Structure formats: C-alpha cells, structure tokens
Amino acid sequence: MVMLLKDIIYKGIETVSTLYPEREAREMVFAFLEHQLGTKRHTHIMEPAYEVSHEDAEAAMSAFGRMAAGEPLQY
C-alpha cells in the first residue's frame, strides 16, 4: 500500500510538533523527506498525487516518532 506524500507530511508535522513548535516541526519534516526521499519542499503542491512506497512511508513515520521522542534529526 502506498501513501501520498502530502499525508506523510501532515502526519509527520502532527507527530513532531508534540515536542517542537509547529514551524520547527515543519522544517524538520521537510528536511528529513528531502534527504530520505529526494523530494523538494514543494513536491506535494506541484504533484498532489505523489506516492511514497509503503516501506518509505513506514520508515518516515518511524523517524518522526523518534524525533518526537527527542532524537536529533541528524540520527
């Protein structure tokens, strides 16, 4: 099952903003996705149907959970 990039972004921001201010959480999510998936900050706007594989989506959600637990983005 694939997920849309925009859904991953929204869930990521929601998860990470439990520890960080929303603006900072947004920046962290975009930075992670740019590095991990090679997407740009505007990809979800330019390509609303951009799909992410199940494996990549799960890896992203796991990383967002770790960020929300205080693990630095660099790890």
Predicted regions mapped to residue ranges:
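Non-catalytic nucleic-acid substrate-recognition regions in nucleic-acid-modifying enzymes
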Residues: M1-R26
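Extended aliphatic helical segments
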Residues: V2, V16, V29, I45, ...
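Membrane-targeting and insertion segments and their boundary/processing signals
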Residues: V2-D7, F30-E34, G38
